[in-house]
């Protein structure tokens, strides 16, 4: 069929283009845009490819998911969306297969820890399965669109008048959170510049345009200023399975200073950043870029004698974090295991 062949080639081109974008580092896109694009591609794969049952579809999604995640292992949002879709397929198949889902809501910790992957049979064919899965993915896309607004809506519960708030670098979620609070409260924001990328300057400009009193400082001054700070509010790239963070370089320093001064550290992050990965998975955790910002190529004499590494991310252990604020509310780091079980199936943690 020429129509289906054209659809197939168009889909292949879209996937290839997305994979190439990931290989180049994702470009200027935010994690939310990456999540939406991944879901859009997976939805098209489900619609355009031929498959007869849930087992075949899951294998297809896994194969394409592995290809996408291998292109840029540090972009964990892509893998998270693949796992969400796999969980949707399992749930929709289970409903059609007559398996009740109600018991899942009341599982105990013991059950969560001891339940292995049940050898379910996904070979039955259901005509409704595709439309049900597409509908569930569309609902997830709608949920993604409202994540930032849902997080920002909780701002007034956490930020009070005349407080001094500290943040680091640039985060769209934190920016929206602070701007929402500024509509009714007056407070002062101190932004650590996040060298060598200095994204904190962009954050400071955006906040000052919104009428928020803002000060930019160097990362070296974090500890000296922390005694004046009431709260630290940061964003993150990934929330790891143990409740830790993979956040911009300098965040660990900020978190340690906050812990020393007993300053609450709040992390604003939507649920699609929650990943079942652990910090020992080096390929996906570390990301290094050219160290030109730290040591310019003009310093030729020194360059011959030293080896310079410029990591993009810091590891922030869960004991330094006070609270996570997501689009579904506030949670302690110790509750991450529960959220993980609701979002992803244990068999899908490794694609």
Curated annotation (Swiss-Prot):
It is linked to Leukoencephalopathy with vanishing white matter 2: An autosomal recessive brain disease characterized by neurological features including progressive cerebellar ataxia, spasticity, and cognitive deficits. Brain imaging shows abnormal white matter that vanishes over time and is replaced by cerebrospinal fluid. Disease severity ranges from fatal infantile forms to adult forms without neurological deterioration. The disease is progressive with, in most individuals, additional episodes of rapid deterioration following febrile infections or minor head trauma. One of its GO terms (molecular function) is GTP binding. GO terms for biological process: central nervous system development; cytoplasmic translational initiation; myelination; oligodendrocyte development; ovarian follicle development; regulation of translational initiation; response to glucose; response to heat. Activated by the chemical integrated stress response (ISR) inhibitor ISRIB which stimulates guanine nucleotide exchange factor activity for both phosphorylated and unphosphorylated eIF2. Changing residue 171 to F: In VWM2; with ovarian failure. Acts as a component of the translation initiation factor 2B (eIF2B) complex, which catalyzes the exchange of GDP for GTP on eukaryotic initiation factor 2 (eIF2) gamma subunit. Its guanine nucleotide exchange factor activity is repressed when bound to eIF2 complex phosphorylated on the alpha subunit, thereby limiting the amount of methionyl-initiator methionine tRNA available to the ribosome and consequently global translation is repressed. The keyword Transmembrane helix does not apply. InterPro entries: eIF2B_beta_subunit, IF-2B-related, IF_2B-like_C, NagB/RpiA_transferase-like. Disulfide bonds: none annotated. It holds the Pfam family IF-2B. GO terms for cellular component: cytoplasm; cytosol; eukaryotic translation initiation factor 2B complex. Keywords: Cytoplasm, Disease variant, Initiation factor, Leukodystrophy, Protein biosynthesis. SUPFAM superfamilies: NagB/RpiA/CoA transferase-like. This is Translation initiation factor eIF2B subunit beta. Component of the translation initiation factor 2B (eIF2B) complex which is a heterodecamer of two sets of five different subunits: alpha, beta, gamma, delta and epsilon. Subunits alpha, beta and delta comprise a regulatory subcomplex and subunits epsilon and gamma comprise a catalytic subcomplex. Within the complex, the hexameric regulatory complex resides at the center, with the two heterodimeric catalytic subcomplexes bound on opposite sides. It is found in: Cytoplasm, Cytosol.
